[in-house]
Regions:
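A conserved beta-strand-loop-helix scaffold within acyl/acetyltransferase catalytic domains
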Residues: 205-252
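Short amphipathic alpha-helix that is part of the acyltransferase structural core
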Residues: 1-4, 8, 173-209
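Glycine-rich, flexible loop segments associated with nucleotide phosphate handling
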Residues: 126-132, 186-188, 228-233, 267, ...
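Conserved active-site alpha-helix within GNAT-family acetyltransferase domains
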Residues: 142-156, 274-309
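Acyl-donor-binding surface of acyltransferase catalytic domains
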Residues: 3-184
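Conserved glycine-rich acetyl-CoA-binding loop
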Residues: 68, 246-261, 273, 302
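A conserved short alpha-helix in the GNAT/GCN5 acetyltransferase fold that borders
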Residues: 84, 254, 263-271
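Alpha-helix termini
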Residues: 90-98, 120-125, 223-228, 269-288
Length: 309
């Protein structure tokens, strides 16, 4: 930690199904003293029912501490090739008939796409959907991405998505993050499922209703509106891997610090869903000494980068 945080949090979140798989190059049943600490390793969690969203989370030893020379590369290449071969044998489940995202639609008067990245639109993220030989990996470390590209394992038709660089933000939440008050005229709430079409219309990354309903969320609503017309003006979720995701503030309400308020609200009140499964190592009271949050932000998404600082 925190290099492997995405994989770690995804496993902590649970919501496993018969099609979930955990692949490891390390025999986790063998005693630690029987393993060579210098041998590279790779671990992956696979859930292909998540299509077209992230289906695979991985972590590898060389991501945390990359060796100075290239002597480790042949072993790493073999581990990656072996992992991909195993993943390729995991069949994706038939698409559910409800909560589809191929045509997410939009409420009247809304633009068709609101882009988190200036260079990628929703169609790019859906290109792989009809080809189950392609799986979407999430939060891939640059060292592992280089190996995947060198081995020719990245779909060339998905280059717009696959080669889009992201910056990883790690948030140390040990100092008791607290929620901050909103400006007058706004209140916190949760994202109501009836507003999922609105949420999905504001992001180019495909989202499924069946995923959103599982996730911790926070929304900001204006006060003084009738209950029949009430809809959020800002929202955010914690993803399956606890990353800050689908963060959005409507244009008319930007510049008020609402994005950071949403982030603090989620981190202060909803991270325990993941932390409750932390190993109980720490001080004499059994307190866990690890309290990290994280977010992946496209390098051309300047507004979200400001939120992470």
């Amino acid at each position: 930690m925190p290099t492997c945080i995405a994989l770690y949090r995804r496993i902590q979140f649970g919501h496993f199904n018969p099609g979930s798989h955990l692949f490891s190059s390390v025999n986790l049943a063998s005693p630690t003293h029987e393993r060579n600490a210098n041998d590279p390793w790779i671990v992956a969690f696979v859930d292909r029912t998540c299509r077209p969203e992230t289906e695979v989370w991985i972590a590898a030893s060389w991501e945390h501490d990359t060796p100075a020379d290239d002597s480790w590369l042949p072993q790493a290449d073999n581990l990656v090739k072996s992992l991909i071969e195993r993943i390729s044998k995991v069949k994706s489940s038939p698409q559910e008939t409800s909560g589809t995202v191929v045509n997410p639609g939009k409420p009247p008067g809304l633009p068709s796409t609101f882009k988190g990245s200036a260079s990628v639109d929703r169609d790019h993220y859906l290109q792989h959907l009809q080809n189950e030989q392609i799986a979407l990996f999430g939060s891939i470390h640059s060292a592992t991405c280089k190996i995947l590209n060198r081995l020719g394992l990245v779909d060339p038709n998905s280059a717009a998505v696959s080669n889009l660089p992201y910056r990883k933000y790690i948030f140390d939440l040990e100092d008791n993050v607290t929620t901050r008050s909103l400006p007058p005229g706004f209140v916190y709430g949760k994202v109501d499922p009836k507003d999922y079409p609105l949420v999905k219309s504001r992001t180019q990354i495909p989202r499924q209703d069946r995923t959103l309903v599982k996730l911790p969320s926070v929304a900001i609503y204006p006060t003084g509106t009738s209950s029949t017309t009430l809809q959020p003006i800002a929202w955010a979720f914690l993803g399956l891997d606890a990353s800050l995701t689908t963060l959005h503030v409507e244009p008319a309400y930007r510049g008020l610090g609402l994005a950071k308020s949403l982030s603090l609200k989620l981190f202060s009140e909803d991270m325990n869903i993941y932390w409750q499964h932390n190993p109980t190592v720490g001080d004499e009271n059994g307190q866990v000494d690890e309290r990290y949050g994280h977010a992946d932000v496209a390098t051309d998404n300047i507004a979200s980068q400001r939120t992470g600082t």
